[in-house]
């Protein structure tokens, strides 16, 4: 036997802590590295088995699809979570991927469950292996990251409600620990402290020197008024949310008896490292530098608390990001380098007119456009006894004539296996039960304008986001690995260390650095 990064007789960890940072950027860790202390990001990078980058094998990544992929070890084509929302054309409205009318919320009005995720998660398999004895919990800013990282069989998943700022959950999960109840209603609750919370620079302004593009010398200052509708959604995009996550996570470490059972326990924690919602149209800000600086301190506090309560030697730490980054930066006047505007509503209207010219005007042949996909009126096509594949192909040929369209893929082509290196990302990132009839890929620099003054325009950028992956604790020796690994390899690696089956849709092998090679 050749032992790689593990001790020869490595024990199963008593606790698994999955730390996922929404919108984490590896390049920002590098840019801001000199402002960090020794026991946060630097501790992870120096004491862990560090993979330079993980790759998600599909396009249009968002929070829901990223978290489902990381925790199931499979892509959306299997786990079914293609995005945070989908469009219900029958009722003409957006619907959360988590929506489930059969369950009500605790400390929230939302009706959520994980039932639309078709694959099992790491936590589900741990529950099955332990016959329910392991405790599995998740804490996150948003319901998507909380519920999808917890899974179907978890004890509980908690997120901050957008309306009241309390830690919310769904009655799908039976566990509501007393200390969460006490926290929500006590002097430590967010509402009790909100008036005193002001976000200003933590460091002197000259220390925020990673970007030479900040033009003003005015320190930022943000306050939060509970009476405004966007109070908590905005707060959830500041460093305060990570401190709130830590406050609750420390309650779980203190009272949850993690690591004391005969079977391992699991705690999934999500932090936020994206732009502030109030200035989404700006990049290269002092705010993002301050977010990382404060997150470094929060990581230090959390890792130290785990070490003190359970011991890092008894804990497997899994640290990574969500593989995407949201920016609404707009081009200054006169600086639009290439591209133009793509108007989905006009596209749908013209396509419908084209199909009416061919197949008649007795019906509307197109339902609508959502998330770069066009949905045809399949009932009308079936009633007219027309061939769906032929109509999809004709529609695709017509759409390719539009300015700004790079490629159009049909649902039939993906179902029939007619994909190539360029279109496999559409097959991986969509699910056959939810996919549109046509998937449109626009050229970089083009702007999607939905002709809705309430919506921001979306500028197409095809940049990859560097997303590190770190395994630390539990006898793992420090090493840096510079090959790219797949996001679907994370879950089977964690289950391998736990000595349990991988999630049921996971087809990847565990990373070989964490296995014993014969």
What are the roles of these predicted feature ranges?
Residues 25-31, 54-57, 108-114, 232-239, ...:
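Second-shell loop/turn segments in exported
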Residues 1-12:
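Bacterial Sec-dependent N-terminal signal peptides
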Residues 29-78, 135-139:
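Short, structured active-site-proximal loop/turn typified by the sulfatase FGly-forming signature C/S-X-P-X-R
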Residues 62, 85-110, 119, 124, ...:
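Secreted, luminal/periplasmic, and some membrane-associated catalytic domains
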Residues 75, 83-263, 272-279, 403:
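His/Asp/Glu-rich, glycine-adjacent segments
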Residues 345-386, 456-498, 514-518:
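Substrate-binding rim/cap in mid-to-C-terminal beta-strand-loop elements of soluble/periplasmic
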Residues 28, 235-261, 274-315, 494:
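A long, amphipathic alpha-helix that forms part
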Residues 12-17, 47-51, 78, 131-136, ...:
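Loop/turn elements at helix/coil->beta-strand transitions in domains of secreted/extracellular proteins
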């Amino acid at each position: 036997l050749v032992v790689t990064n593990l001790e020869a007789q490595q024990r199963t960890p008593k606790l698994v802590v999955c730390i996922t940072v929404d919108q984490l950027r590896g390049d920002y860790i590098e840019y801001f590295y000199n402002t960090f202390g020794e026991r946060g990001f630097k501790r992870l990078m120096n004491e862990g088995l560090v993979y330079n980058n993980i790759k998600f094998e599909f396009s249009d990544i968002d929070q829901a699809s990223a978290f489902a992929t990381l925790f199931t070890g499979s892509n959306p084509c299997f786990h079914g979570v293609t995005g945070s929302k989908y469009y219900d054309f029958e009722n003409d409205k957006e619907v959360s991927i988590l929506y489930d009318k059969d369950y009500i919320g605790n400390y929230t009005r939302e009706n959520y469950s994980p039932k639309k995720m078709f694959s099992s998660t790491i936590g589900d398999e741990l529950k099955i292996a332990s016959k329910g004895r392991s405790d599995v919990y998740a804490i996150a800013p948003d319901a998507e990251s909380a519920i999808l990282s917890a899974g179907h069989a978890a004890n509980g998943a908690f997120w901050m409600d957008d309306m009241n700022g309390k830690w919310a959950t769904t009655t799908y999960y039976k566990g509501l620990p007393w200390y969460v109840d006490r926290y929500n209603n006590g002097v430590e609750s967010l509402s009790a402290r909100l008036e005193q919370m002001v976000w200003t620079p933590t460091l002197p302004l000259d220390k925020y020197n990673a970007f030479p593009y900040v033009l003003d010398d005015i320190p930022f200052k943000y306050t939060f008024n509970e009476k405004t509708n966007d109070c908590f959604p905005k707060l959830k995009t500041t460093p305060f949310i990570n401190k709130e996550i830590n406050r609750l996570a420390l309650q779980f470490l203190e009272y949850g008896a993690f690591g004391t059972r005969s079977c391992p326990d699991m705690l999934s924690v999500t932090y936020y490292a994206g732009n502030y919602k109030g200035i989404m149209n700006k990049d290269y800000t002092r705010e993002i530098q301050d977010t990382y600086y404060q997150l470094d301190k929060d990581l230090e506090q959390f890792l130290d608390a785990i070490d003190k309560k359970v011991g890092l030697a008894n804990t497997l730490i899994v640290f990574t990001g969500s593989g995407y980054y949201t920016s609404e930066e707009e081009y200054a006047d006169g600086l639009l380098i290439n591209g133009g505007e793509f108007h989905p509503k006009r596209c749908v209207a013209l396509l419908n007119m084209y199909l009416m010219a061919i197949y008649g005007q007795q019906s509307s042949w197109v339902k609508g456009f959502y998330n770069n996909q066009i949905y045809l009126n399949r009932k009308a096509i079936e009633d007219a006894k027309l061939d769906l594949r032929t109509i999809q192909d004709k529609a695709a040929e017509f759409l390719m004539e539009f300015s700004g369209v790079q490629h159009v893929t049909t649902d039939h082509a993906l179902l029939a296996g007619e994909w190539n290196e360029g279109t496999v990302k559409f097959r991986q990132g969509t699910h056959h039960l939810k996919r549109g009839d046509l998937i449109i890929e626009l050229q970089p620099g083009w702007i999607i304008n939905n002709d809705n003054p309430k919506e921001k325009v979306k500028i197409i950028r095809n940049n990859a986001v560097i997303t590190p992956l770190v395994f630390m604790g539990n006898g793992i020796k420090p090493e840096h690995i510079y090959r790219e690994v797949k996001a679907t390899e994370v879950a089977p690696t964690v289950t391998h260390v736990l000595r349990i089956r991988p999630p049921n849709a996971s087809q990847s092998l565990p990373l070989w650095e964490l296995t014993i090679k014969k």
